[in-house]
């Protein structure tokens, strides 16, 4: 009799992590809601499409609703699972109308300041808590960054921001197999180059 494959906390393949999370923590074979669907990269290798495929970019195909992840318009306590894969880079100016234009920054792959990133993440977590049923699952993919010459430990901040609404259920690390995006700056290196990202599994807990 074959032993079942052991689910590990570390993979270099995001599809293995997604499959592991779905196997261990999500009812059914996919998520109910993808808050930041994009081009649907999570579903390229056989994971079924979510019922609610949301994104702020109205030029994308296959989304079910154009909306901000902080204001989905879905009913309160109506879904069992949510996945959130927001931008993680700062100092992104591409196609912005101003350095503080948070909506435009999310649409074009990054934020200008860490405050902008923090605001978007916190409001999206609060919205996910609103639409999830008690004991529902929220999955967040994130990466720590160096911002303004300081390490911004995004995954630790997420745990703090979510603690009012969620319990930590599981944590996966994805090791990069290629060079990950980073600001293009010259000068002496001050921090270790980041070659991993986190997948945080949270469980909604109505207090």
Regions inferred by a protein language model and the residue ranges of each:
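Class I S-adenosyl-L-methionine-dependent methyltransferase catalytic core
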Residues: 1-207
């Amino acid at each position: 009799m074959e032993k079942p494959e052991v689910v590990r906390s570390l993979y270099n393949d995001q599809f293995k992590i997604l499959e592991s999370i779905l196997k261990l923590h999500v009812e059914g074979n996919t998520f109910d809601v993808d808050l930041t669907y994009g081009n649907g990269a999570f579903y390229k290798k056989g994971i079924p499409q979510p019922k609610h495929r949301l994104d702020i970019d109205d030029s994308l195909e296959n989304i079910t609703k154009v909306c901000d992840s902080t204001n989905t318009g879905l009913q309160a306590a109506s879904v069992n699972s949510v996945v959130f894969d927001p931008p993680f880079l700062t100092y992104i100016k591409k196609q912005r109308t101003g350095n503080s234009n948070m909506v435009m920054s999310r649409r074009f792959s990054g934020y200008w300041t860490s405050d902008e990133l923090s605001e978007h993440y916190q409001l999206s977590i609060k919205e996910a808590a609103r639409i999830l049923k008690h004991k529902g699952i929220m999955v967040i993919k994130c990466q720590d960054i160096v911002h303004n010459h300081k390490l911004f430990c995004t995954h630790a901040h997420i745990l703090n921001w979510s603690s009012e609404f969620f319990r930590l259920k599981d944590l996966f690390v994805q090791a990069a197999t290629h060079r990950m995006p980073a600001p293009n700056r010259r000068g002496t290196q001050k921090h270790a180059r980041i070659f991993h990202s986190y997948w945080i599994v949270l469980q909604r807990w109505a207090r």
